[in-house]
Amino acid sequence: MGASFLNLVTTKVTVKGEEQKFVSLRLHQRFNRHHAFTVIVNYLSPSNTFKQTPEKFINYVGETVSISFAHKQTGESYDFEGVVTQVEMVGSMGEAGGVAIHGASPTILYENNGTLDSWMDQTLSAIIKEATQEYGKVPLASNPKYSAKIPYMAQYNESVFDFMNRLSAQYGEWFYYDGKKVYFGKPDKDNTEKIMYDVDLEEVRLVANLVPGKSARYDYVAQENKQHNADTPAKPDGMNDLQSIAHDCSEKAYGAKTTAAANPHIADKAGLDGQMKVLKNESGANLLNIRGIGKTCRIRIGEVIEVSFPGDMNLPPLGKFRITEITHEVRRDGHYANTFAGIPDGTVNIPVPDAKLPLALPELATVKKNDDEKEQGRVKVSFDWQKNGKTTNWVRVQSPNAGVSDAVSKNRGWVFVPEVGDQVMVGYEHGNPDRPYVTGAMFHSASGKGGDKNNKTKSIITRSGSAIVFDDETGSIVITDHTGKQLILLDGKDAITIMAKKSVVITNEDKSVIVMDEKSIGMQAETISIEGKKNITLVSGNESMVFSSEKNIINGSATNIKLEATKEYDLNTQTGTMKGTNLTVEGTANMTITGGIVKINS
């Protein structure tokens, strides 16, 4: 038979230093949850209740509540501090009256509405410290096992509590309140209470569950261009013998393996392997549970109990279990009882079944840096809600076309990295707020003017002012440099114009060159050919020379025409005439005139 005296406790409840004479008390505690309590204070009648001024009870809201249990015979005790969240003054049927004081663990102060914040290249410990720094009333012990720096982390429309709960789920960290202190990360306390069935417990249940445990995750690390894949390990860490049996049964039943994207984002294969180990350990925690009804407040949230049976039952111990949920109840007469649940003590990572994972939606940001140290075309952006100089880490920029080819090892495609100061739209891979990327840039009233009337103008203009402008009305294309004075115009009417303020140079690999500058045109090549199907006209000042295919003549309007060769000059024709008012043919050494018949003065 059980020892009934263990049920009797001395319970003390104080609010603002004032002890409350209560009718009943209930305190519910659970890992990754706010604890909740209700204390009913009996004032016997409505008149007695409402003789108390409402201001007195309203002023309880937000105040600290201290609750302590102490067994009368053994002195075993448990202390809890919370915060009053609601007070009810009740009158019922004209006969009964009382006050209900509702409250929660101090973690409720982390529920200061959803907010936005971010961290870059910080450890989990540093992130938790900064996220909670304005909540000094909540005693916190942060000692997460995960110690690597996280490239980028965002608190996205989440309360501090929901944010911490999510991180607890993603990184496999413990998160709970023990009555005095909030723990993020497994605490360094492993005291074990020996609990005996039928003495300390009215009821005990050992529960084995069928739990799926086979899964795979994948992730892509862009800065290394590496795809990582990993499966869950064969077995969870820290299993006891009974867990192992339950695990083998579950593995046989669930043969299929599920696949999902990694969450959180990882930096390397080791990070993904670690994530898979957390998933497996969390599934292992659900394989075997203990549940029961207890008579002693030595069963405490977060602590270990070792459950055994009386000697006359001749049964082996059930083993050690970590308490993850417990409800304490005390009646007016001091009768105490609790209901509890626990998982095997060897559990490394505790599952968080309903952690809220935020869904990030596209939003505006401003480019702060684009000088990517790894030369991968990435940028750092700042959202409107980021303060104190905070930005994202380096994020990728979406492009209509991007990649490599056999001929192009880098920058094949469309390369337009946004400029510092540009407004951009940011999306998120898998809706994950920790994985932003730039989807495109946005014009606004100070940066855009549209495509002119009828949306006729399309353009590409760089930071310096170099431009390609398309006109859909004329069909023209204009290419200009940053000065606007050097251009190539395709006018849409079968004409191309090339214009430069100083010179135009056309050259090829063999160094044939045409140079046009302000006052001259030069041509240089091994062979230069000029062909006119009818005429070729050369003009210099007021003088011109025409090469005519019809008249077979060179006609010069100049006063003098001089033909000169330093070695030989040959003039061949079937019939030729040299005319002049005065005509001199001279050979300074010799002159020879030959022909079939030579006529002089004939």
Q: What does each of the following model-derived ranges do?
A:
Residues 1-602:
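Amphipathic alpha-helical and helix-coil boundary elements used as assembly
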